[in-house]
């Protein structure tokens, strides 16, 4: 376990973005701790990062854990400094005890043995159910460490299915649920596979160029130039590909990403079936989405929202001029404002 301290100045940044809400963050010294925790499966450890205001007691209703999507780890997006501060920094500076976790196969977490073999040598690995198990290990670690019974849970993209599945089975451990770009049943059928296509392997290889093209796919041409702050894509890509020790063995460098999520998408979301039942979620839930999300279009978030039939309350926010990765774009403070508006509000009496 490693711990370090970071002095960040957030007053001006937050004052300009949150002045309308009358909020102003003071300078905060954040304590950062990196830990490897057991997954509960032999030989598999999970990377967990924690940030919170140094020297401040933990508030039981201000603890949040974030889980990533299908291709990239949590650390290099949620904790990527943009203009000096990351989304994780911003939330922690508001007095939150913030965690991120990488499920097995991603970031600094253990890569299953199949990832050291050619992808075609094994079937897809790390299903959504396995990833939800890993999220559960992180939640239990945090509950034990902070001696609380519930925490806030946030997932992005595939992480919404990880977090949603987990919450549907463990409502008693979740205070609030945030789903950023949720997966749901697709209208369009999957692209037909070629007759000679190879079976889906254990993992796939992803290049930086393909990541950039995917990021900007549905952004109008005249809006692309200033969508991503200068240097952010390069900083994110360099940090992300550096998490894979085998990326440099390819030219160009290639990031390994597990294919369990792809198999689940083919067998469920693209086959007209739900992977789990959102109707089993019984905690306050926020859905965040951006209008130019090419990976998971708006109708998916709307369809998912309709299935949240047993939450005490629910909210769907559509952000303008943003993509699947709005959290790292020019309108990231819109994202932050809506997120904190949900997390900061007091519980209804019925939930106390």
Regions found by a protein language model. Give the residues of each.
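Short, surface-exposed "cap/lid" segments of acyl-processing enzymes
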Residues: 55-100
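Alpha/beta-hydrolase active-site loop
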Residues: 119-145
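Catalytic histidine-centered segment of alpha/beta-hydrolase-like enzymes
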Residues: 322-333
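Conserved alpha/beta-hydrolase "acid-adjacent" motif
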Residues: 294-300
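Alpha/beta-hydrolase
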Residues: 188-286
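Conserved hydrolase catalytic core segment
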Residues: 146-188
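Glycine-rich "HGGG/HGxG" loop immediately N-terminal to the catalytic nucleophile
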Residues: 74-75, 101-123, 324-325
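N-terminal cap/lid segment of alpha/beta-hydrolase-fold proteins
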Residues: 26-58
């Amino acid at each position: 376990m490693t711990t370090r301290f970071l002095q960040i100045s957030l007053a001006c940044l937050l004052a300009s973005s949150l002045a309308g809400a009358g909020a102003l963050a003071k300078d905060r010294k954040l304590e950062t701790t990196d830990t490897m925790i057991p997954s509960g499966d032999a030989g598999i450890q999970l990377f967990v990062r924690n940030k919170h205001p140094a020297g401040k007691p933990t508030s039981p209703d201000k603890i949040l854990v974030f889980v990533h999507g299908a291709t990239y780890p949590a650390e290099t997006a949620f904790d990527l400094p943009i203009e000096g501060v990351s989304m994780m920094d911003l939330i922690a500076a508001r007095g939150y005890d913030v965690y991120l976790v990488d499920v097995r196969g991603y970031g600094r977490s253990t890569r299953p043995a199949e990832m050291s073999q050619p992808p075609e040598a094994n079937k897809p690995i790390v299903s959504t159910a396995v990833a939800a198990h890993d999220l559960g290990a992180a939640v239990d670690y945090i509950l034990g460490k902070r001696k609380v019974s519930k925490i806030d849970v946030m997932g992005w993209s595939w992480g919404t299915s990880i977090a949603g599945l987990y919450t549907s089975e463990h409502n008693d451990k979740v205070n609030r649920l945030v789903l950023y770009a949720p997966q749901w049943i697709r209208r369009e059928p999957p692209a037909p596979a070629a007759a000679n296509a190879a079976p889906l392997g254990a993992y796939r290889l992803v290049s930086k160029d393909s990541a950039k093209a995917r990021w900007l796919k549905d952004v109008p041409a005249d809006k692309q130039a200033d969508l991503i702050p200068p240097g952010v894509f390069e900083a994110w890509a360099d940090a992300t590909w550096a998490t894979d020790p085998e990326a440099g063995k390819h030219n160009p460098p290639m990031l390994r990403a597990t294919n369990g999520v792809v198999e689940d998408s083919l067998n469920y979301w693209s086959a007209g079936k739900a992977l789990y039942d959102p109707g089993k979620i019984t905690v306050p839930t926020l859905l965040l989405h951006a209008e130019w999300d090419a990976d998971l279009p708006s109708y998916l978030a709307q369809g998912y929202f309709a299935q949240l039939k047993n939450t005490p309350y629910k909210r769907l926010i559509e952000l303008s001029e943003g993509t699947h990765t709005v959290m790292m774009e020019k309108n990231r403070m819109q994202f932050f404002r809506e997120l904190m508006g949900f997390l900061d509000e007091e519980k209804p009496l019925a939930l106390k």
